[in-house]
Amino acid sequence: MISASSRSLPWRNLSVAFWLWLTFVIAVPIGAAQTKGGHGGAGAVQKLPETERALRANVQSGRLDDLRWPDFSDYRADVANFYRPSGYALTWIQGNAPTKRAREMVEILRRADAEGLNPEDYDGSRWVERFAHLESSHSPQGEARFDVALTVCVMRYISDVRIGRINPKHFQFGLDVEHKKLNLPSFLRELVSEQTGLEARLAEIEPPFAEYKATRQALLKYMELAKEDDGEKLPQPPGILFAGGLYEGISRIASRLRLIGDLPQDAVIPPDSKVYEGPLVDAVKRFQKRHGLTPNGYLTVDTVEQLNVPLASRVEQLRLTLERYRWLRYSFTQPPVVVNLPEYRLRAFDRDGQVGLAMNVNVGDAYDFQTPVFESGIRYLVFRPYWNVPPRILRNEVIPDTAEDRSYIVDNDMEVTTPDGQVVASGPISDSVLQQLRAGKLTVRQKPGPENALGLVKIIFPNEHHVYLHDTPESVDMFSQEHRALSHGCIHLQEPAELAAWLLKDKPEWNPERVERAMHEGRDNFTVNLTKPVPILIVYGTAVVEENGEVRFYRDIYGHDAALESALAKGYPYPK
């Protein structure tokens, strides 16, 4: 007979066996996951939260001390939006090592100087050590720091190539980069997911101008030339040195001009020569032409000063010019008119992107009347215009001169008017009228005619600065001077009739002959509206690459280069 106790034993043994089996089934995957550290197991759940927490903490702080410029608060929202869709998963790391895309991107960051940028802004020299540390440490915190560091550096690089490092509004320039800003999280996700064409994809966000690409090529050339610059200075001659004169620096000037390409390599200059002549004079003329100097071959103080500028400084001029190209809009509704202030030059572009018209200009005085940098649209022309004296000139010049000489206004073909244009006085000025002028109740304008300060035509593009293009009664010889920062802020045109005809070329009735008649024989203050506004850019670039590849350098007449260089030296976060 079987007892109750003996019958219960098989059940108890089965129960024990079942629980042992169940424990084994559950335990094996956990162990496997912990061993492999892969995706989808409890081990991954153990590891991913730690990495995720580290990523979140680094992003939320907006600061990463591993970076050369640790504060990335200006990019914090973009970085967070980049990681959020993936649940804060690592982007640049796979199997405890940088991904192929990470290595490709770092190589581009390390070569940022070819774009006129500073590789150290993107930790260029730090990535080799980071790669080695990442592959040896296997630390979740280290992986998170690496990943966030690369994300921040890549975002900075993309933004810098696209719109520049510093917002031009920081310098009170009227240029808008906001419309060009990229959706950085979206763009970067595309960049990471695409397996080919990284450099081509990045090239799509660069300024599309041929001038930008030419300037970048010139930068590469001058970076190499700067390596050969020994820094030795040319001696200043005792006075202006003409062809045939004696000069102790013949060997040095020949070496300098050969290096930068103005003196042919095969030009024969005796090593012990002390005579300034022949090929050297021709080379100096070429140099002068490229540096905004009168190309007469005279070795002047200004010429020697420009020859002594270190080539590293020329490299910096090219870099700053590339930065300013990034501030410009990338497309235009009509071919634009562009005025480059340091060059004293205007260019009007055709639909094919070629220069259709170019001329010299005079710009605002460097001390009191700097012409501002901004963009607008030319809307109309006024032939034989009045000159409405700007408040500043009225206050600082016309009123004091009138107080000393009550005939000043009539002698200068001016008249006093009410704000709505009603003439109050055009003869000697009374005390009452002078008092109203001082109080701002009356204003002054100059009558139309060849002696008018605006000449015979003005070209209007609305702006807060009261700046426009116009003719001038001054001698045409002034447009061949080296220094042409001479105006009260407006831009004087060397060939005003040609620009007027160019702007009106879509109006068949306004041929060049009619433009000339309107200027010299037409009605006073006659307005002609353009069919469509023509974009105009007033820009500032001290390095210019011509269509033939010739590189030209100009003086920093307003100190804008110095201001930009100083601001860039401060590092991130740059003013946005």
Predicted regions span which residues?
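Zn2+-dependent metallopeptidase catalytic domains
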Residues: 1, 32-133, 137
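Short, Φ-rich (hydrophobic/aromatic) sequence segments
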Residues: 102-113, 150, 157-158, 215-218
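N-terminal secretory signal peptides that target proteins for export/translocation
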Residues: 1-12
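Well-ordered beta-sheet/strand-loop patches within structured domains
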Residues: 32-78, 82-84, 148, 152-156, ...
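Bacterial N-terminal signal peptides
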Residues: 15-27
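Serine/threonine-rich, low-complexity intrinsically disordered segments
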Residues: 4, 25-28, 32
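Mature extracellular/secreted ectodomains of secretory-pathway proteins
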Residues: 115-179
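Conserved S/T- and glycine-rich ATP-binding loop of Class I adenylate-forming
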Residues: 1, 20, 284
